Amino acid sequence: MDKLSSKIRAEFLGFFKNSGCAVVPSDSLIPAGDKTLLFTSAGMVQFKQHFLGQSKDSFTRATSCQKCFRTSDIDQVGTTARHLTFFEMLGNFSFGDYFKKEAAAWAWEFLTKNMSLPKDKLYITIYKDDDEVAGIWKNIAPANKIIKMDEKTNFWNMGETGPCGPCSEILIDLGQETGCGSPACCPECNCDRYLEIWNLVFTQFDKQPDGSLKNLPRKNIDTGMGLERLSATVNGRKNVFDTDLFMPVMENAAEILKIKNEGSNISKLRMIADHSRAITFLISDGILPSNEGRGYVLRRILRRALRQGKFYGYNKPYINELVSDVLKIMEGAYPELSSKLSNIRSIVKTEEEKFLETLESGSEILSSLINSYKSKDINIISGKDVFKLYDTYGFPHDLTKEMAFENGLEIDEDKFKFEQKKAQEKSRVAWCGSGERDITFYSILRKKTGDTVFTGYDNYASESRVLALIKDGSEISELKTGDNGEIILSHSSFYAQSGGQSDDKGKIANNSFESIVEYIFKPAGNLFVHKVKVLKGLIKINDAVSTIIDIERRKQIARHHTAAHLLHKALREAFGGHITQAGSLVARDYFRFDFTHFSALKKDDLIKIEKRVNSIIRLNSEVCIETMAIAKARNAGAMALFGEKYGDEVRTVLIKNESGDGNYSMELCGGTHVSRTGDIGIFKIISESSAAAGVRRIEAVAGIAAENYILDEEAVIIKTSKILNASKEELVNKAHKYTSDYKKLENEFKSLKSSLISGEIDSYAKEVKKINGINFLSVIADKADIKALRTISDQLKEKLKSAVLLIVSKNEDRASFILSATADCVQKGINAGKIAKAFAASINGSAGGKPDFAQGGSKDLSNLNDAVKNAHKYILL
């Protein structure tokens, strides 16, 4: 009977716990506080500060099962026995504690005793010059199983300089049948016979610029072993996909696609299973599909998986269904998946639906393009055409490349990159002047001045000293009347924009100097940069000044920030634990709160949420600020922002519950808040909308802003009452009556317009052309709306009996069209939807529809007349 992967995972962590290691939970796939990495790709990532000796954690040895994601081998996923994008890395670590002897002995014990792997099948590779580890292994394993390798395979470097060290790899012989067949095949061979299971890295040196090695004061251990590989090995499988981590997903995918999990289908099903796991965990960790960064990678693998279904003629969303299979397998180790299932599935399904639409329209345009290139015997699609597909129609570059390859063509990569870069440059020009500054400049400045001490939690004003002055991007010695510049202070009561909260406004002044503070930001660490306009006087470095904030602005922002915490909690109460903050803006006039949720909130839901928040406000509950250990805060249930890097000590905002003996809300937060919920006054939701796939957005107001909003609404009602000559009580009924009367008049007008159109039908009918035995007519009906176009089309079909009709309306800034075909033309192979898309492409527009009817439009009128005249050519496609 197979050993479950969940049991292997638990046994590994238990083994090293018994060896004195702290069991550390998996970190997010978004590396916390490390902007050099796009994803967490190894178990050691979350321990970087420990390896550098900069962590305040008490443990010096640890073990973990870390979620990892890599795309370096994405093209090999499904085609080999071992490559994956998402995987779990089992690891044990030492930070100046145990070293080679213990690491080697424990690894061998766990594999041979706990996992019962045959000793005669295991091999150990070591660095050729590491005599220390060679001696250790000789006391553990047979000498003929220990193989010395060179620096390329068995010496780890962080970079050209810095921490480095030798490593030992443990491999297992999977048998001759899996290898290259050569009699000389050995662990040094690159075939599939010898599978690396575990890598033990011994970080003991500091590489110098001249290449020499110095001993590190603290020697560290970093090991990594893929759970998927170990599970396959323990259960006698030659392939990671033949384990309980993948098989249920593959089997359900095969059932959905109505194919067998065998033969040529296997590689596609493996890719689908791998990508489904990755998609589930990426979204669970807060990544959403987008066109850049992590979101783009997610979008790419989701689309890549979905497209495998189209290979079998399956044109519906299905990856979202596989998310449930992933959950069943993984929820024991990652219980947070359960509360997020509905949201993850909704996000995936929405993205699938969008891509299927893109794929349909883009594929047809690309197919037409490919046929055009083939007819001209051109084998390379221009980069300009590839970029247009990407930029105008949202068709992925990598998909264009794949489809071109399938048709024996290539794409001009260099020209595509040139067009892409050109578009990026345009974007940069538009972006210039947005206020972003060179972070390197401020990082260097911070080393000289140190961080700013923020005094604003308890004080609206503070005494300070000028540490640096900046103008036009350069340090200067003074600022004078009329100057715009930046001031760096030793202390500041101003809140710098961060954590979604807007910055303070106010003054920096002394007896002979006064400036208005326009913006405060933190470009590096806790260095506060105050952008100012000097009203009078002169300020120099080392001058003493006072910082004085706009108190009413601060109080109003605080009302909004505390209200945002109440809203967050109320949403989780109403809809469940899958609700998490996905972004926010806390300003003076309003606040915006983005949260993960799979559907729009109903009006009744919004009323319920609003009432709940106001009920907590009326309780006048105490709002407490406590600084506590991060572990204590998390254990107490404090909400934390995903992807944020927190120190060992965190600032926690607690809002007391109804009885006052517990907390209604508890969040890690560095922002400013009211002292009691009653200080908020009143809370009012002003809108709810979609912010992104799987993310909803609520905009709301509180305090004075809510009061002003309600007064404005009241003013609109009063004004409307006067216009309609109705009391408030009569207003709704009277508005309904006027609306009803307007619709009647509108229908009468349309009827009259339709009568006028009917008079044009005979003249239109005279323009019919015969194309391959098909009656084809294309006409422009100026300024007709879409309903009028339908009327013209219906009347022409009735008159002509058999025809394909393109009826176009041209207005001031847009063209709209419908394309219809009678039933007999459809039977002859005419597809109105395809013709409409081809025509839309010729006018830089878009279209969609069915074989008998389609519609579309474009904002580009430059080529419209010629395109309509030449539209008959699409009948020939």
Swiss-Prot record:
Cofactor requirement: Zn(2+)
Subcellular location: Cytoplasm
Cofactor, free-text remark: Binds 1 zinc ion per subunit.
Entry keywords, A to Z: Aminoacyl-tRNA synthetase, ATP-binding, Cytoplasm, Ligase, Metal-binding, Nucleotide-binding, Protein biosynthesis, RNA-binding, tRNA-binding, Zinc
Binding of Zn(2+), residues: 561, 565, 669, 673
Family: Belongs to the class-II aminoacyl-tRNA synthetase family.
Name of the molecule in the record: Alanine--tRNA ligase
Source species of the chain: Endomicrobium trichonymphae
Gene for this chain: alaS
